[in-house]
């Protein structure tokens, strides 16, 4: 027993001599915040603006200035409408669109519309620099209100408006004689699709929806020479009066010493164009 204790004591002393204390590893922590920040990894974000602005290309009008005779076919109605289209010099996007509906004498012959009615009057005033794009559709029958013609006309206007980036808040409809019948029908049916209406020398053939008519400013015109013209003037007076009674904005201008044929052009004086474009 005594020997065993001595052996254990010797082993303990040998182990104690062999063991060497290892110094502890200490991580130094700086108490200086500035020093800590200087040792951090920082990603710099530039706040400088580009020295040169990105150039925006100028708007390029999709059609050259001038006269066009084309045909539109409506996908829904499958009806056709021939039309004369005038693009003025200096045309740009968001221009107004002025539509002129012809009378019986121009049915089926859109080439006549290049020098007739509103187009003729505008060219005498503005030359080739109209302040609007002019559209003169041409029917193949003596009516603007039969069948699907009104719907096809709206389709044509939508097509032109999209292709030429028209200002859809400035779509003006005008017409002479049977074309005036079409004007009354279109504002009665489509209301504020149009921003203004100028019917010349004819009343309506069907009952008008006053709820729609009062949404459109109307400046009607009629001459005072000829039996038929006097009848048309009376018809138009009654319509204008009814629109006013229902709270709408409508007036009738009597063109002194003008017959039915003459009113097709003389109704479109410069102040009338200005009125149309202001509505």
Segment roles from a protein language model:
Residues 162-163, 169-214:
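Primarily recognizes the serine-hydrolase "nucleophile elbow" in alpha/beta-hydrolase
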Residues 113-125, 156, 201-211, 234-238:
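Alpha-helical scaffolding within the catalytic cores
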Residues 219-227, 233-240, 244-279:
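C-terminal catalytic histidine-bearing segment of alpha/beta-hydrolase fold enzymes
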Residues 4-21:
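Sec-dependent N-terminal signal peptides of Gram-positive bacterial secreted proteins and lipoproteins
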Residues 89-93, 141-178:
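Gly/Ser-rich "nucleophile elbow"/oxyanion-hole loop immediately N-terminal to the catalytic nucleophile
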Residues 97, 101-154:
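Active-site machinery of serine-nucleophile hydrolases
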Residues 17-97, 174-176, 186, 238-250:
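A domain-start/cap signature at the N-terminus of enzymes
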